[in-house]
Each structure stands twice: as structure tokens, then as C-alpha cells.
């Protein structure tokens, strides 16, 4: 039949299949920023296209060409990619300047800060449900400094649906 789709029975897919979650991690990214001192309270940052040397622009959907000052709360409300990227840049020990190059000096520390915070919410670790074939997600050991930026808005590591459900239930 035209337009028909084949479906596969996958009763355990919520614990075995992983995907890159995207914006859902932004609450945990804010937590990592607060705990590390990279940001404080409802700090205002400028949501603007992020221009890193020799890289494509990173934008937020609502300000893909312009800029706008937003608080941490608004960054969640508007799902700001660039607010999260600025947190990652601060975790790298740098301040955002258009056209900047990223230093790799604090790359491991920054990624560890993000991943450890995410793990506290259940992402990238076993849920303890004791079900067969549970995946802990896909957490690459090798990464570069650009991956730290994309990790901050959920476009690098991959998690299971049950991990994300646990995360959402904990917040």
C-alpha cells in the first residue's frame, strides 16, 4: 500500500535504543553552569548568532539573525541554543567574542562538568531498572572542543527514552 510503513516490534526500545535528544538537556546545562560558577541566578546573556572561527554559525531559532538579551529562565522558555553555548564557552574558561578561536586547555574539564551533571539526572548512566539489554547511552570517549559546545544544547551524546524520562521526572 502506498505510504504504508513497516513497523518493528521493539518492546524494549525505550531502554535499548539511543538518540541525540536535543533541547531537553538545556535544564541540566543550566544546572552545570550554576554549580560551576559559569553563570549565576537568572543571569542575562545575549542570545546572538555564535561565530567561532572556521565554524558554521550556531543560532537559536528565534534570533537566527539578530540578538536579544535574555535571562536563564527565558533561555529555557525560548530554547536558546546560544545561551547554552555561551555556558559551554565559560566552562572552557573563555568569554565569547565573535570570530574567536576556542582553546582546548579546559576541554576535558568542561565536557566532564556537563556529563557529570547530566549523569546526576540519569542521562548516560544505567537507570538501575534491571532490564535486559539496557543501554547507558552513547557517550563518545573521543571528542573535540566543538563537541563541548554542541553537547550543551543536546546535539552530541545520545540517551535512551527511559533515561530522559528519569531526567524529566527528577526535575
Name every feature range the model reports, one short phrase each.
Residues 1-22, 28-171:
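Beta-lactam-recognizing serine transpeptidase/beta-lactamase-like catalytic domain environment
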Amino acid at each position: 500500500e502506498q505510504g504504508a510503513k513497516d513497523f518493528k516490534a521493539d518492546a524494549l526500545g525505550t531502554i535499548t535504543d539511543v538518540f541525540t535528544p536535543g533541547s531537553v538537556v538545556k535544564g541540566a546545562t543550566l544546572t552545570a553552569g550554576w554549580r560551576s560558577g559559569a553563570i549565576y541566578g537568572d543571569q542575562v546573556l545575549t542570545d546572538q548568532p555564535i561565530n567561532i572561527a572556521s565554524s558554521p554559525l550556531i543560532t537559536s531559532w528565534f534570533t537566527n539573525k539578530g540578538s536579544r538579551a535574555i535571562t536563564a529562565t527565558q533561555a529555557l522558555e525560548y530554547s536558546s541554543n546560544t545561551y547554552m553555548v555561551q555556558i559551554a564557552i565559560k566552562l572552557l574558561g573563555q568569554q565569547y567574542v565573535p570570530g574567536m578561536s576556542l582553546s582546548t586547555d579546559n576541554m576535558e574539564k568542561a565536557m566532564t562538568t556537563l556529563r557529570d551533571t547530566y549523569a546526576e539526572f540519569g542521562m548516560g548512566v544505567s537507570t538501575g531498572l534491571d532490564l535486559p539489554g539496557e543501554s547507558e547511552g552513547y557517550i563518545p570517549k573521543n571528542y573535540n572542543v566543538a563537541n563541548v559546545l554542541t553537547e550543551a544544547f543536546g546535539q552530541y551524546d545520545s540517551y535512551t527514552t527511559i533515561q530522559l524520562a528519569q531526567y524529566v521526572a527528577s526535575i
